[in-house]
Amino acid sequence: MKLQLMICLVLLPCFFCEPDEICRARMTNKEFTYKSNVCNGCGDQVAACEAECFRNDVYTACHEAQKG
C-alpha cells in the first residue's frame, strides 16, 4: 500500500493527504475543499491513496466534521 502511494505521489500530479494539524487548522477556513482530503487524478492509485489517508483516525474525524 505504501509503495503504491509513493508511486502515486512521485509519478503523478495528485492531491495527497495533509498532516492532521493542517486539516484541523482548515476547519475554520470557509474556503476549505475536499480536494485536499483525498487523492485526485491518480488513475488506478486513487483507492490506495484514500485508504492511506483515512487510516489516520484523527484525520478521519476531521473529515467527518467537515461533512457536518
Swiss-Prot record:
GO terms for molecular function: toxin activity. GO terms for cellular component: extracellular region. Keywords: Amidation, Disulfide bond, Secreted, Signal, Toxin. Expressed by the venom gland. The modification Lysine amide is found at K67. Residues 1-17 form the signal peptide. It comes from the Eukaryota. Disulfide bonds join C23-C53, C39-C49, C42-C62. It is found in: Secreted. The keyword Secreted applies. Comprises exclusively 4 tightly packed alpha helices (no beta strand is present). Arose via modification of ancestral neuropeptide hormones (ion transport peptide/crustacean hyperglycemic hormones (ITP/CHH)). This is U1-agatoxin-Ta1c.
